[in-house]
């Protein structure tokens, strides 16, 4: 029976959470702290420690709720072992240097507000004419002063005219204010970054000055939309947690019970902390602080039906009847609650599964069945779930960022971003390097001393041996572990590289050099089997150079008869290109030197037979190893080929490693070459050659055995560990290709492009996803193999420098146990989740930029408005890139949007992509092979949030509704109301666009225009007035109309089309007639953004001239799309009778009053003509159903979706989590017994 090691009291105060290692025996030495990479056992007490850790509080309990860190999510994963866990010898080198996004953490993180979040705010408006005598201070409130009475008293203790609504967001990281009564103070800031100005992103193509839209026109709207898009990715991503034990940070406050205040008697339990002065939504307090009797009466008659606090009927979630969270009715609005609900839906869809997480970890451990050799004494990780009778409530918010969408985002990022491919390749190299660096490396001097020392009497007595040895050492090219690492990383990205052959210079040709040159050439094929399978042209050129050195006549004969190879259509290519082409440029598909030799002379000479045997040996595939993992919930199925199987060395007298067995056949070929050389007189004299070769073969055999140990023990094990990470990230297996000239590529969906009428997309033809050319990242040639063959060996190698290692006659098992324990799978998973979050934000940002440019992200009205007005003109490649950057893609020159520097990327610097498909393609095709469309990369929560934000700002119920149609008239009004419109005229005029000039006898020209006219009858129907009416000026037109209809036409209304093509002379005449109050104007197709203001009549008169000027600007403008800002006034805030001298030139055709809770609080007749509070609209009963949806009950008792029917509801329930349950659950975890090792 195992016992768990207990944490010391001091450990509770540390910021870092140390794992608890279970052991079966107390006499076993405890592993060094902070270095135990074994499976960890985390009892429930750790969760309490996580919550109380100060460093985690600053980041909002990151361990539980932030996508960037999930180590704490293995709370219920436990392992026990009969052995002390080894200290791993290898690990990830530093933190991943992956390309980061500006908002990666912002988009995936969770906020933890200390006060109630809000979207809408109620704002009382003081009356301008209230007597000082009415400013009576409210009654003293002797009880329940906290938390809302002081704030309410400050807002409602003065005389108010009305209570209106505005957007005033209270949310961590977001500043958003949109007030329909003060549009000039509009502000949208996310994480300190303001919504960008479209002027700066259009290169000056569209500005307020040259667009003709005015300062509140199209650029302003586009800027707001961009800000709303940034808000949509962050808003609602919060969790309310009441930090019990820390009074300062608690979000719930207790009410002081006081039965003497009947207005508050129905409020129970505890309240969320709030800024009740900024958000005075607790209307129960109004009867206590206001001096308006009818206002108090309205509140008292209605508000007691609306719950407030924690005492309500919504059942809280619980664990075994323990309260771990509860709903609290608070003063926030249903819109903010809906944003939060959308976030919870996202959390639910990505809910963390311990079973799947354990499967993921177990798919990343070093598997005993995949390690060959003597593994009995080794230890291997194995993860298993512990039995947990009570589900910890904190895990309801634990997520794993993997689903169909994130998988598509990752696949898209791999194909689209060259910067990411390079960054991930570099990180894979760092993982490989952590294992390759475990190699022991000798020097050429060590090798020379080993074979020329006093003890080597045989070698020293053979004088020619020194010449052989010196020639071998001269061929050694310095090769570092970094070189090997970068070369091995090619095995995992072969389809993404466009490699070209490199030349190998062979020196003097003799029997001894044949042995080592053939051996090292075979070694490069063995160490890079995947790379050569994707680049057969490299192998063909390498074999050609070797054969030209040792079989020059034979290879010329073969190529003369069979050619260099054939192309994709089977046509023979006879000549070898003078300049070796790269993979993408190669016109040869199948190479003669890589095929079986069918050409045989009638009497084949010995050298021909050796030549064909050598080709057969070089083309015989060495047995690679495939690391296979099935599909699981958090990863796709992958087959990753590595150069060979990892093998544990078990002493010098064991069987030779597979690669050594394969390579030892080189000695027999070299022996045959020596025999033939003796016959033809190549190289040294016969006696010297025989003596040298005898000693040299012994050395080479020992070097081959040494290489075999290093290859299987270090090189293949490094590849094995890298394969575990590779299979998570990359969308392709690296198995041998069906078409070695096919590259991963990305291409637009042409059918969808045509539907959107997009003709200038940059990726209509597939764009290959290549790595940039890098001379340091290429296969290792034969010269490098000389270095590896002689100088590299494992720490437990039985052979060193071509000689049996007397000091390592048995394996060093403590070192081997530590080495083969492998890299911690949790580290790999952390990198995996970082990449998933990176891909999620990247793919989402790119698609958001795309859908903004096409308008698909917008409502139909906004799409028409912006698509024709700005996007068609300005949304260039540069704007697309800058917009993506605004959304968070990249912050430095090394950003994920940057180009890699490859030739392909240089021709594809346009970042736009609209409907991406991925697949394979060759340079000979213009369509993807195995096309795989990329799905929707935008989170549903972001789409829903953005739709709600657009509706709340620009929709019919929004703060700045965009509507079509307004009229212009200089008629008089005694007072103004928000519902006021210009009176409908009986006659309307539609001007024609053409005109002619008539000349009199004095050759003076007279412009003649034409129009049609309609008479509007009592039913509103339009009846045409005659046919086309000709006129020279407006006064003449009105006289002609009066004659036709039979009565005096007064101020007819002229229709102005959206696309103004009227002659300039006529426009000037219309302006003159309008300013003379002769005609009215109607702009039925022009779009309007409204704002509101309470003004005195004098202020209205001052604003009239500005609107007259705006009418002139509109008529003189020739821009296709218009959007204008019109202010609507109300003068009833000032009581009294005024002369009919006010003119309000611009008024909407269909009036829309601002969102007001109540009006006319101070009127002489106690609210006669005013609007009482509409409790059904602003304070309905909002409940949460079993699925988490918000439902509002209307006056008929019917429950409907709250956000669509009651978007302004100012009291909704929010879920608040507690901490005390974690303490109560302490000690309930019972772990299973799971063996590690044998």
Swiss-Prot record:
Assembly and interaction partners: Homodecamer; each decamer is made up of two conformers of VP2, called VP2A and VP2B. 12 homodecamers assemble to form an icosahedral capsid.
Summary of the function given for this chain in its UniProt record: Inner capsid protein that self-assembles to form an icosahedral capsid with a T=2 symmetry, which consists of 120 copies of VP2, with channels at each of its five-fold vertices. This capsid constitutes the innermost concentric layer of the viral mature particle.
Other information: Function inferred by structural homology with BTV-fold inner capsid family.
Organism field: Cryphonectria parasitica mycoreovirus 1 (strain 9B21)
Region Disordered, residue ranges: 1-35
Protein name: Inner capsid protein VP2
Compartments, record wording: Virion
UniProt keyword annotations, A-Z: Capsid protein, Inner capsid protein, T=2 icosahedral capsid protein, Virion
Basic and acidic residues bias: start-end ranges: 7-30
This protein's record includes keyword ATP-binding: no
Transmembrane segments: none
Principal localisation: virion
Record family assignment: Belongs to the turreted BTV-fold inner capsid family.
């Amino acid at each position: 029976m195992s016992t768990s090691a207990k944490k010391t009291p001091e450990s509770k105060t540390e910021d870092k959470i140390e794992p608890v290692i279970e052991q079966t025996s107390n006499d076993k030495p405890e592993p060094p702290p902070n270095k135990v990479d074994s499976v960890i056992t985390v009892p429930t007490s750790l969760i309490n420690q996580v919550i109380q850790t100060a460093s985690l509080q600053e980041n909002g309990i990151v361990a539980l709720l932030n996508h960037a860190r999930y180590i704490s999510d293995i709370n219920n994963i436990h392992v026990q072992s009969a052995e002390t866990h080894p200290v791993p010898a290898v690990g990830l080198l530093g933190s991943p240097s992956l390309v980061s996004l500006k908002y990666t953490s912002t988009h995936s993180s969770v906020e933890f507000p200390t006060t109630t979040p809000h979207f809408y705010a109620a704002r009382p408006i003081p009356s301008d004419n209230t007597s000082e005598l009415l400013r009576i201070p409210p009654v003293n409130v002797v009880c329940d002063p906290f938390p809302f009475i002081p704030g309410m008293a400050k807002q409602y203790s003065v005389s108010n005219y009305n209570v209106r609504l505005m957007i005033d967001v209270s949310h961590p990281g977001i500043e958003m204010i949109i007030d329909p009564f003060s549009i000039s103070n509009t502000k949208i800031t996310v994480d300190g970054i303001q919504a960008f100005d479209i002027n700066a992103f259009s290169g000056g193509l569209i500005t307020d000055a040259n667009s003709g839209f005015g300062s509140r026109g199209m650029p302003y709207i586009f800027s707001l939309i961009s800000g709303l898009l940034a808000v949509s990715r962050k808003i609602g991503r919060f969790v309310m947690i009441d930090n019990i034990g820390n009074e300062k940070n608690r979000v719930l406050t207790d009410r002081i019970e006081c039965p003497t205040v009947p207005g508050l008697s129905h409020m129970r339990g505890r309240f969320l902390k709030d800024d009740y002065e900024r958000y005075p939504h607790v209307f129960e307090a109004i009867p206590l602080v206001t001096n308006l009797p009818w206002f108090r009466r309205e509140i008292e008659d209605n508000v007691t039906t609306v719950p407030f606090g924690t005492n309500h009927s919504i059942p809280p979630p619980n664990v075994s009847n323990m309260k771990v969270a509860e709903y609290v009715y608070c003063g926030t609005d249903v819109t903010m609650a809906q944003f939060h609900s959308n976030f919870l839906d996202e959390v639910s869809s990505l809910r963390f599964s311990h079973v799947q997480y354990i499967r993921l970890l177990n798919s990343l451990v070093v598997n005993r069945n995949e390690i060959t050799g003597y593994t009995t004494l080794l230890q291997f990780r194995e993860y298993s779930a512990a039995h947990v009778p009570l589900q910890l409530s904190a895990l309801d918010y634990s997520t794993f960022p993997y689903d169909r969408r994130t998988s598509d985002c990752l696949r898209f990022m791999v194909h689209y971003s060259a910067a990411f491919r390079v960054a991930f390749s570099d990180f894979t190299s760092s993982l490989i390097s952590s294992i390759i660096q475990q190699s022991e490396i000798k020097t050429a001097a060590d090798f020379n001393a080993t074979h020329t020392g006093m003890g080597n009497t045989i070698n020293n007595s053979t004088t020619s041996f020194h010449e052989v040895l010196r020639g071998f050492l001269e061929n050694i090219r310095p090769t570092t572990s970094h070189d090997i690492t970068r070369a091995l990383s090619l095995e995992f990205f072969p389809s993404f590289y466009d490699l070209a052959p490199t030349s190998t210079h062979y020196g003097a040709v003799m029997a001894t050099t044949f042995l080592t040159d053939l051996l090292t050439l075979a070694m490069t094929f063995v160490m890079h089997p995947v790379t050569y399978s994707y680049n057969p042209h490299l192998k063909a050129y390498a074999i050609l150079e070797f054969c030209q050195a040792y079989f020059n006549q034979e290879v010329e004969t073969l190529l003369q008869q069979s050619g260099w190879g054939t192309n994709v259509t089977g046509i023979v290519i006879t000549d070898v290109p003078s300049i070796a082409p790269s993979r993408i440029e190669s016109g040869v598909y199948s190479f003669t030197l890589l095929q079986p030799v069918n050409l045989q002379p009638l009497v084949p000479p010995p050298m021909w037979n050796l030549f064909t045997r050598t080709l057969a040996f070089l083309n015989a595939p060495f047995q690679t190893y495939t690391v296979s993992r099935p599909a699981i919930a958090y990863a796709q199925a992958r087959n990753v080929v590595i150069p060979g199987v990892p093998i544990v060395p078990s002493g010098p007298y064991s069987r030779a490693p597979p690669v050594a067995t394969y390579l030892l056949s080189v000695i027999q070929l070299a022996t045959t070459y020596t025999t033939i050389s003796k016959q033809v007189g190549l190289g040294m004299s016969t006696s010297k050659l025989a003596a040298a070769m005898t000693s040299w073969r012994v050395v080479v055999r020992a070097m081959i055995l040494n290489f075999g140990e290093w290859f299987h023990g270090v090189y293949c094990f490094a590849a094995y560990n890298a394969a575990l990470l590779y299979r998570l990230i990359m969308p392709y297996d690296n198995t041998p290709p069906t078409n070695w000239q096919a590259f991963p590529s990305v291409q637009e969906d042409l059918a969808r492009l045509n539907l959107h009428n997009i003709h200038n997309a940059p990726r209509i033809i597939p764009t290959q996803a290549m790595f940039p050319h890098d001379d340091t990242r290429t296969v290792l040639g034969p010269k490098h193999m000389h270095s590896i063959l002689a100088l590299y060996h494992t720490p437990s190698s039985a052979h060193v420098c071509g000689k049996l290692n007397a000091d390592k006659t048995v394996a060093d098992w403590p070192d081997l146990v530590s080495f083969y324990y492998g890299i911690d799978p949790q580290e790999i998973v952390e990198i995996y989740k970082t990449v998933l979050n990176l891909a999620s934000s990247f793919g989402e940002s790119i698609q958001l930029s795309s859908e903004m440019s096409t308008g698909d992200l917008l409502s139909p009205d906004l799409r028409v408005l912006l698509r024709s007005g700005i996007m068609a003109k300005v949304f260039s490649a540069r704007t697309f890139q800058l917009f993506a950057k605004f959304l968070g893609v990249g912050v430095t020159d090394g950003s994920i949007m940057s180009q890699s520097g490859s030739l392909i990327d240089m021709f594809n610097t346009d970042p736009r992509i609209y409907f991406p498909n991925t697949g394979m393609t060759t340079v000979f095709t213009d369509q993807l092979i195995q096309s795989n469309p990329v799905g929707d990369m935008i989170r549903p929560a972001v789409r829903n949030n953005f739709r709600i934000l657009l509706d709340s700002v620009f929709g019919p119920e929004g703060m700045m509704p965009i509507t079509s149609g307004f009229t212009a008239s200089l008629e008089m009004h005694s007072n103004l109301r928000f519902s006021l419109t210009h009176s409908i005229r009986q006659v309307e005029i539609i001007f024609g666009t053409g005109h002619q000039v008539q000349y009199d006898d004095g050759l003076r020209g007279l412009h003649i225009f034409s129009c049609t006219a309609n008479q509007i009858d009592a039913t509103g129907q339009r009846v045409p007035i005659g046919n086309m009416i000709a006129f020279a000026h407006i006064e003449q037109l009105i006289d002609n109309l009066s004659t036709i209809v039979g009565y005096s036409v007064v101020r007819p209304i002229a229709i102005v089309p959206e696309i103004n093509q009227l002659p300039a002379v006529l426009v000037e005449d219309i302006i003159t007639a309008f300013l003379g109050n002769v005609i009215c104007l109607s702009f039925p197709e022009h779009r309007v953004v409204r704002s509101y203001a309470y003004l005195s009549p004098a202020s209205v008169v001052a604003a009239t001239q500005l609107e007259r000027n705006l009418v002139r600007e509109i008529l003189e403008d020739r821009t296709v799309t218009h959007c204008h800002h019109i202010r609507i006034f109300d003068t009833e805030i000032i009581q009294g009778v005024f002369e009919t001298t006010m003119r309000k030139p611009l008024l909407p055709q269909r009036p829309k009053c601002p969102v007001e809770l109540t009006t006319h609080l101070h009127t002489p007749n106690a609210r006669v003509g005013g609007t009482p509070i509409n409790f059904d609209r602003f304070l309905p009963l909002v409940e949460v159903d079993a699925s988490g949806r918000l439902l509002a009950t209307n006056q008929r008792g019917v429950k409907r979706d709250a956000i669509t029917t009651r978007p302004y509801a100012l009291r909704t329930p929010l879920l608040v989590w507690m901490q005390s349950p974690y303490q109560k659950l302490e000690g309930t975890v019972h772990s299973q017994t799971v063996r590690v090792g044998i």
